[in-house]
């Protein structure tokens, strides 16, 4: 009985909510991390114009299928979407806004690796319309980063975090917990260092 009441009220609330959350997948990476099971691929080169056209065509199709909605969030994931040209990011954001409009306070997130090459693009990514970056630190221990197959070291990760905080209104980061042999005290030290 309580479940039926709960389902009816949730269903009514969902029917009244015309918001839309978009996920945009960029499947390319510079290298494949050994722990990653996401749809991601290492490629020497990517036809950027072809991918941009495909993303915009897919977005236009979805806009026709889902009219009358407002975008509450866009999440660029991957792969490594910080490798996406900022012009493509801006084009997708612009097409989404033109198709649906944005809800107040729309959050537009892009996942990024903390390599210095990618961190140097944070200003351009923010100018494209991204207001939150999710930084894949994964660890703040150089031996753990090597074990995880990451391309950056601790210092580069912390510099990228600082750069991200200067470029974006909102920043989050990933730290992998319960790595083989990791003690709780080590996790706490890494977390405290990232939050400092």
Where are these regions (language model features)?
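Local cysteine-cluster metal-coordination motifs and their immediate loop/turn environment
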Residues: 25-40
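Residues at the beta-strand->loop junction immediately N-terminal to the Walker
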Residues: 23-25, 77-78
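Sequence-level motif detector for i,i+2 pairs with an aromatic at +2
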Residues: 17-19, 33, 71, 105
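Short glycine/proline-enriched loop/turn "hinge" motifs that connect secondary-structure elements
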Residues: 16, 26-27, 163-165
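Conserved non-cysteine loop/helix-boundary elements of the Radical SAM core domain that shape
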Residues: 40-65, 69-196
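N-terminal [4Fe-4S]-dependent radical SAM core
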Residues: 1-22, 67-69
């Amino acid at each position: 009985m309580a479940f039926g009441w709960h389902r009816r009220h949730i269903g009514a609330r969902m029917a009244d909510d015309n918001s839309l959350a978009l996920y945009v997948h960029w499947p390319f990476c510079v290298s494949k991390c050994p722990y990653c099971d996401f749809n991601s691929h290492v490629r020497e080169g990517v036809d950027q114009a072809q991918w941009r056209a495909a993303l915009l065509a897919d977005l236009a199709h979805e806009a026709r299928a889902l009219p009358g909605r407002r975008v509450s969030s866009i999440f660029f994931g991957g792969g490594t979407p910080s490798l996406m040209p900022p012009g493509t990011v801006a084009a997708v954001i612009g097409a989404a806004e033109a198709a649906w409009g944005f809800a107040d306070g729309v959050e537009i997130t892009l996942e990024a690796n903390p390599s210095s090459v990618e961190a140097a693009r944070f200003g351009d990514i923010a100018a494209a319309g991204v207001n939150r970056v999710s930084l894949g630190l994964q660890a703040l221990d150089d031996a753990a980063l090597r074990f995880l197959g990451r391309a950056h070291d601790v210092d580069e990760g912390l510099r990228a975090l600082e750069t991200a905080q200067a470029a974006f209104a909102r920043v989050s980061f990933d730290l992998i917990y319960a790595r083989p042999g990791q003690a709780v005290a080590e996790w706490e030290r890494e977390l405290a260092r990232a939050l400092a």
